[in-house]
């Protein structure tokens, strides 16, 4: 399969301006493609990963990958369909640029990937040059018809955000000129901005100039919910914001209805292996082979091979109940979402400890559960109602992990 056929098979192609022309350009020599991202946060999230996966596929097909960090456009803000964006300070933008640049460098490595900042050219552009050299080439009538602009006409859109499509068009032309970039890749909401850039290139370089655009479908799960969040929280690529274990678990917990689609979209596995995994989902869903492979592949791409091993080792320890040897960081990672309570850093009788922490509703119930072997502290079963709990004995004195029954966990956080 060629690059476009592969995208179609994976369900990763929404619109394309000139399929035959792009394939012809790719066959005639090495051409560049780019994805742009504005530093509106200090980390990328899963929504950003989608166009980067397509760019990586383009690179694997023999193309040159270019990534724009929007140092200039990030100061403006890509218009949203509903409300105006809050402008970020220059200090915050600089900090965000630093974090995102490090992330895309890690994703793409050093193999023929160019990472550029559009402040290098937009930052040098005077207002007069902007209006004279570019403003004259954009029709207000056409700009007003772009989907995101049209959706804001009733509620209002600032001139700042209205001109964003011009700036993105300039980006495409600059990369066309500087880096031999012929293709822009973006989400489905970027179609209008991408075609504006192609029109600008044709206006400046002639209608024969080769410039193409493709967009990716909006990713949703089988229920129609927008993809990329877990219990309402964004899944970040920064390991400090979403740990590799949580990231791994997000993929491992995907349902049978979605996992094959995500294997096509988010991994570089071939059709034969994905077909085999789809067969496993159909014939033996309880084994969850497809989900495990999905978690392994995406975690490896984002965080590296060692992160996969650490996540799987932690999963094994949790499944077996062997939590005594885990580090404080692993405990915080794995049990950050369970009910928690504050605990004093003093030795306390187990019955009092359980009641004071809200693990048990009464001392009678606490004594009964302890005597029946239903309580484990830091991975060790406690059956003596006279036992004393030393909060500083495990996990660097930061936590006490309580399990009631087979699956109910509570995390005591030491004051």
Swiss-Prot record:
Compartments where found: Cytoplasm
Entry binding sites for ATP: 229
Span(s) of short sequence motif 'HIGH' region: 39-48
Top-level taxon of the source organism: Bacteria
UniProt motif 'KMSKS' region: location: 226-230
Principal EC category: ligase
Record key words, sorted: Aminoacyl-tRNA synthetase, ATP-binding, Cytoplasm, Ligase, Nucleotide-binding, Protein biosynthesis, RNA-binding
One cellular component (GO) term of this entry: cytosol
Reaction it catalyzes: tRNA(Tyr) + L-tyrosine + ATP = L-tyrosyl-tRNA(Tyr) + AMP + diphosphate + H(+)
EC number: 6.1.1.1
GO terms, biological process: tyrosyl-tRNA aminoacylation
MF GO annotations: ATP binding; RNA binding; tyrosine-tRNA ligase activity
InterPro entries: aa-tRNA-synth_I_CS, aa-tRNA-synth_Ic, Rossmann-like_a/b/a_fold, S4_RNA-bd_sf, SYY-like_C, Tyr-tRNA-ligase, Tyr-tRNA-ligase_bac-type, Tyr-tRNA-ligase_bac_1
Pfam family of the protein (one): SYY_C-terminal
Domain S4 RNA-binding span(s) in chain numbering: 348-415
PANTHER family the UniProt entry points to: TYROSINE--TRNA LIGASE, MITOCHONDRIAL, TYROSYL-TRNA SYNTHETASE
Family per record: Belongs to the class-I aminoacyl-tRNA synthetase family. TyrS type 1 subfamily.
Oligomeric form and interacting partners: Homodimer.
Designated name of the protein: Tyrosine--tRNA ligase
Gene assigned in the entry: tyrS
């Amino acid at each position: 399969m060629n690059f476009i056929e592969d995208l179609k098979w994976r369900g990763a192609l929404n619109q394309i301006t000139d399929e035959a022309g792009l394939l012809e350009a790719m066959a005639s020599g090495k051409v560049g493609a780019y994805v742009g991202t504005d530093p509106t946060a200090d980390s990328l999230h899963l929504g950003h990963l989608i166009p980067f996966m397509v760019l990586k596929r383009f690179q694997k097909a023999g193309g040159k990958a270019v990534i724009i960090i929007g140092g200039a456009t990030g100061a403006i803000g890509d218009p949203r369909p509903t409300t105006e964006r809050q402008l970020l300070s220059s200090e915050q933008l600089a900090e965000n640029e630093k974090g995102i640049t490090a992330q895309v460098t890690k994703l793409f490595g050093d193999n023929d990937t160019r990472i550029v900042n559009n402040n290098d050219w937009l930052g040098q552009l005077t207002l007069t040059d902007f209006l004279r050299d570019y403003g004259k080439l954009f029709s207000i009538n056409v700009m007003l018809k772009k989907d995101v602009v049209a959706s804001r006409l009733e509620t209002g859109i600032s001139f700042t955000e209205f001109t964003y499509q011009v700036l993105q068009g300039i980006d495409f032309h600059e990369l066309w000129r500087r880096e031999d970039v012929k293709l822009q890749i973006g989400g489905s909401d970027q179609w209008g901005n991408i075609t504006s850039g192609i029109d600008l290139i044709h206006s400046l370089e002639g209608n024969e100039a080769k410039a193409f655009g493709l967009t990716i479908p909006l990713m949703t799960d089988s229920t129609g919910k927008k993809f990329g969040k877990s219990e309402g929280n964004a899944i970040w690529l920064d390991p400090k914001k979403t740990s590799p274990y949580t990231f791994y678990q997000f993929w491992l917990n995907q349902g049978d209805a979605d996992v094959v689609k995500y294997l096509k979209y988010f991994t570089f596995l071939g059709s034969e292996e994905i077909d085999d995994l789809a067969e496993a989902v159909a014939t033996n869903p309880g084994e969850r082979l497809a989900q495990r492979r999905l978690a392994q592949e995406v975690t490896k791409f984002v965080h590296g091979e060692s992160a996969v091993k650490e996540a799987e080792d932690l999963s094994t320890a949790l499944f077996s109940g062997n939590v005594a040897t885990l580090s404080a960081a692993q405990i915080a990672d794995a049990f950050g979402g369970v009910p928690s309570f504050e605990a004093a850093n003093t030795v306390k009788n187990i019955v009092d400890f359980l009641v004071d922490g809200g693990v048990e509703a009464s001392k009678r119930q606490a004594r009964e559960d302890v005597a029946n072997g239903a309580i484990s502290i830091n991975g060790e079963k406690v059956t003596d109602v006279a036992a004393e709990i030393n909060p500083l004995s495990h996990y660097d004195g930061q936590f006490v992990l309580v399990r009631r029954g087979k699956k109910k966990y509570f995390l005591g956080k030491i004051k």
